[in-house]
């Protein structure tokens, strides 16, 4: 550990929501990223450096890397969504897109967007987190190279998940293993050898270290305030350790790398710390006769606002409903929940649902990504910036989203449907997360994997199977209807069904049944209704809404 008391760690968010949970394109290898890093610096006057504009990235991705345009936009927009923007700015962008009548007009608006070039290179590099194989590349260059790994956590500290995006030990190991390559990507071309490698005398610019703050942050003497890496590296007492020269205003790459390796430690606000020392939340009750005990924890009591995490596991056979300040702006993970109805009615930063079965999730607006993995027979209802799914079976998604839903690998029997519910604070929460009702791409998913035909991977819910979802809780707020309304085909189906009910009621009323006949008819209807409640699973939800004796 550095003698100055500085602690550095790898930021969680770039990996939680920035690393696509799918193997990256082969052209995102270090070999090609090095070429891109050199290329953009030679095109500074053409919208490539220090800011990379969408048309330039489209040219690089489609023309040189041979990526599809949709895939090029996906990575560009994913990174842009990680940038700091106000909700008002995001809503303004949604309004601009909603006013575009053609694809050409959309492209014209996108052409004005740009990202930080060096940070975007780092973003592309960390997509290797979910690389399936680390075999030697065709050009004979082993990638990623093996580096000294951080000390493995004890079994008690090790998180109970194999999801690398939610495993901060994987984040730390990835950065430590590939720190030299990350730094070399940030070097100016004249600081590299002909084979794109650094030397002992290579110098990094201040802009390069500022870009590295995308991945690394820290604190001093365990203070609660968190600083980006470049602010700590430029701090006067650390100039010798970080290798900063006042005269040249550059960093010695050799000294900076040594300082980073000496100072990097486990993220004190990451998922592992939350599981180990987070505050336990009594949001769920123990189901009688069940050996499963729900575990819910958060770090809101000790983490800065932008580092909030909530983890929940093994919620079983119950209704869990929360609208809480603890959830606001938090990264939330639900793991191994089954046969439950889970309502998280607060604006969330991100939501990950893993290994859950036979349950319904109703979520407040998700500012970044809603991701599902290895789930079966779920109904998910949410407004989100992006939905991505992998290894799901028989799941239905009622969503409102300004981005095309991503179908990654391993999915079966996926159903997409329009968002069909509301709660009183919904529109207020949407405004806080910068999510609008248009554009809405719920019915236009993007298949990222290459598994079978596109039409066999998903279906759109037929209007004849569509019903409104009612949230059975009272809250304060102004939203009294589904924001943005329903697509016309679904609205028409509801109207026809309602008309059928009116006709049926009129028929019963005009039948002039005797008192005994009415009694028999009522019993028949109640029995059929009860059978319907049981067959649809609604009986379980109604039972779980009744407070247990201990909770009442």
Curated annotation (Swiss-Prot):
Key words, A-Z: Cytoplasm, Cytoskeleton
| Any one GO BP annotation for this protein | regulation of cell shape
Cellular component, GO, one term: spindle pole centrosome
Kindly give the Pfam families that the UniProt entry links to this protein.
TBCC
- Tissue occurrence: Expressed in brain and testis (at protein level).
* Superkingdom classification of source: Eukaryota
Domain spans labelled C-CAP/cofactor C-like: 304-435
Q: Which InterPro entries match?
A: C-CAP_CF_C-like, CAP/MinC_C, CAP_C_sf, CARP_motif, TBCC1, Tubulin-bd_cofactor_C_dom
Question: Where does it reside?
Answer: Cytoplasm, Cytoskeleton, Microtubule organizing center, Centrosome; Cytoplasm, Cytoskeleton, Spindle pole
Q: Sorted alphabetically, which PROSITE patterns does this protein's record hold? A: C_CAP_COFACTOR_C
**Chain's role:** Plays a role in the regulation of centrosome and Golgi apparatus positioning, with consequences on cell shape and cell migration.
Family membership = Belongs to the TBCC family.
Under the heading PANTHER family, the entry gives: TBCC DOMAIN-CONTAINING PROTEIN 1
> What protein is this chain from?
TBCC domain-containing protein 1
- Native organism is Mus musculus
The record lists the lineage as: Eukaryota, Metazoa, Chordata, Craniata, Vertebrata
